Amino acid sequence: MDFLTYLPSWLLPAVVILTISCILMLWTKPSKGASGLNLPPGPPSLPLIGNLHQLIGKSFHETVYKLAEKYGPIMHIHMGSQPVVVISSSALATEAFKTHDHILANRQYSNNLRRLTFDYNDIAWAPYGDHSKHMRRVLVTEFLNSRMSKSFKKVLDMEVKSMLDNLPYGTETNLNKVFGNFVCDFTSKVVTGKSYRDVKIRGKTMKEMLDEMIILFSGSFSEIFPKYGWILEDLSGWTRRVDKHMANYNDLLELMIDEHLDHTSEDEKDMIDACRPLLNREEMKAIMSNVYNGAIDTSYLTLVWAMSEIVKNPRVMHKLQDEIRSNAGNKARLDETDTSKMTYLKYVVKETLRRHGPSPFLIPRDCVSHIQIGGYDILPGTKVLINAWGIAKDPKVWTENANEFHPDRFENHVLEQFHMVPFGGGRRACPGYNFATLNIEVVLANLLYSIDWKLPPGLTLEDFNMEEEGSLLVTKKTPLYLVPIKHNTQA
């Protein structure tokens, strides 16, 4: 719902007038009702606007979580005129992903969403079918394979070395910026072979374009008013904003492809080398966009939250550093071979993804036929929203300390498939989840192997801010500042 904060001030009164007019029209028509159906429980809704009055202006995922505490792990709400079912438990997510995944494999679509996804040529948003299966197959078999991973390991090692070498040791450092630059450079190099972080298109950098993409994906009027939302998007300037952004973003991706074709290398292969023979140009841009949007912010935020929790919990930091340093020998830098032996490191990454999953909700699913979940009826045209943030706090799975950062829980916890879903599940699960987690483990291991981390002068653990903000992505409200101190690995 963040998109509403970026709209002009005159638009809300216009929506109110339109709403009143529609309510009057609705009252003159007989209600069809839902006789004989057992819909999920939920809060009372108003005509036309549904439950928007309860959701706008607040932290969307926290508001939904509180409503789910009251109405249950499967809940029916209306976002505008759009019926939505929210699933907030592991057991019901399992039923959705396993029993009804084929019914819930599609998205809900709009004209602006079509623009943002290169005419639905991507993986994440394409209608489920032969095309989406082909795109996913190309990404997995040609890009995320063992042969390509050898090349990526070299890139990762070089980027980790560059990050460590350029840290201002002994000085208060903004790790949001450090991690953001690192992830942007690494992702760009595995996709194109070079960094485009500082390249500008009409004054906009790649990072600024990706930040804008997050805003544009955060919601739209078409999602809450499917029949006439496009009118409000045109009136508000939202459509023009999408078009302006996509002109810049398209030119950036075109530049990447053109420069790559001019400087191909037989020695070092990247994603364009691997996938281009099997994709047309629009498909290539769409899959590049998926990787950039899916990998950069997810990895960056996970690193920020992981380091925040590690520093906030000295016992965790000491235990983790002991494991890393006892397994590392005297190597200059660590790689995947080293981290494969570090059990507690894997617990820390899992707990970070559980406690601070980058996106509180999975991309909404569209129910295409009548099904039942948890004994409740879900009707065609309903948007099904998987509450990953709520599932990660499900007391039936995580007990009473679900809100605490406690990596040791995984020593005794048998993690079943849908106990946590930071990367989705079923047919639309993120294909790069294993690639992402392995890389995060390597980066964290190096940060804690060769560096001791201190709080900035004057800051105590009690004052350390762990507040969240955002809806499509949950970010740390204040940047993470720490002081890196070189650790003597030879001692």
UniProtKB/Swiss-Prot annotation:
It is a single-pass type II membrane protein. Expressed in leaf primordia. Heme binds at residue 430. It is found in: Membrane. It comes from the Eukaryota. It catalyses: 8beta-hydroxygermacra-1(10),4,11(13)-trien-12-oate + reduced [NADPH--hemoprotein reductase] + O2 = eupatolide + oxidized [NADPH--hemoprotein reductase] + 2 H2O. GO terms for molecular function: eupatolide synthase activity; heme binding; iron ion binding; oxidoreductase activity, acting on paired donors, with incorporation or reduction of molecular oxygen. GO terms for cellular component: membrane. GO terms for biological process: sesquiterpene biosynthetic process; terpenoid biosynthetic process. SUPFAM superfamilies: Cytochrome P450. Its main location: membrane. Keywords: Heme, Iron, Membrane, Metal-binding, Monooxygenase, Oxidoreductase, Signal-anchor, Transmembrane, Transmembrane helix. It is an enzyme of class 1 (oxidoreductase). The chain crosses the membrane at residues 7-27. Its EC number is 1.14.14.169. Pfam families: p450. Pathway: Secondary metabolite biosynthesis; terpenoid biosynthesis. The keyword Signal does not apply. InterPro entries: Cyt_P450 (IPR001128), Cyt_P450_CS (IPR017972), Cyt_P450_E_grp-I (IPR002401), Cyt_P450_sf (IPR036396). Its cofactor is heme. Involved in the biosynthesis of germacrene-derived sesquiterpene lactones. Hydroxylates 8-beta-hydroxy-germacrene A acid to 6-alpha,8-beta-hydroxy-germacrene A acid, which, in turn, undergo spontaneous lactonization to become eupatolide. PANTHER family: CYTOCHROME P450 FAMILY 71 PROTEIN, PREMNASPIRODIENE OXYGENASE-LIKE. Belongs to the cytochrome P450 family. This is Eupatolide synthase. It comes from Helianthus annuus (Common sunflower). The lineage of its organism: Eukaryota, Viridiplantae, Streptophyta, Embryophyta, Tracheophyta.
